[in-house]
Amino acid sequence: HLATRTALHAQNVITPMTEFGHNIGDDYWLATYTELTAYWQKLASESPRMVLDTIGYTAEGRPHLMAIITSPANHANLEQHKTNARRLALANDISETEARELSQTAKAVVWIDGGLHATEVLGAAQLMEMAYQMVSLDDAETQRFLDDVVTLLVHANPDGMELVSGWYMREPDPMQRSTGGIPRLYQKYVGHDNNRDSYMVTQPETENISRIMFREWYPQIMYNHHQTGPSGTVLF
């Protein structure tokens, strides 16, 4: 299965192994948000399927990035696809007949985030891996996703990723690395309670995400990734 998938990577974009010296998910290695940013910038520069948008800034002043991944043809009409999603979501200037007709041609908008709780490190890892897979694979299933869907990838807590990954990688002996014992909150003001800020919207990251989801793009599907662990780790 892996050999088959590898053979389908026909798009000429930089691989995680070339960029990091690691595959995403390798043991005893975590990328920082700075490294994620640099990698996404390279993917966006190398592939017409991906555009990077800065949706705001974090509590510590980092650019809060959103990767928009879809087919080149959809990118050429991105504002129209955004308008279609908005009209279908709000339904205040469209009849049922018009909505049903529009739904036949409008693109699905899918939001995928990760890393909200920064010690749940798989969420950030899947954002890097998914971006790479979506811009590099040329199999029929990926092409269908690109044609039918506008995918929005967002790291929900960039400051936390920078802190946790930096703390983890500071230890030169890989066997001694741990995400435990971090000396400060992995979101500057609310720490692990950043998910509960979704109803208060007091933090800049929550403001950025809420604006995109409920004022600009109105995704029909939203994946907010979390992780159980440390034993029997599951991404959900």
Question: What is the predicted role of each segment?
Answer:
Residues 1-236:
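M14 metallocarboxypeptidase catalytic domain recognition
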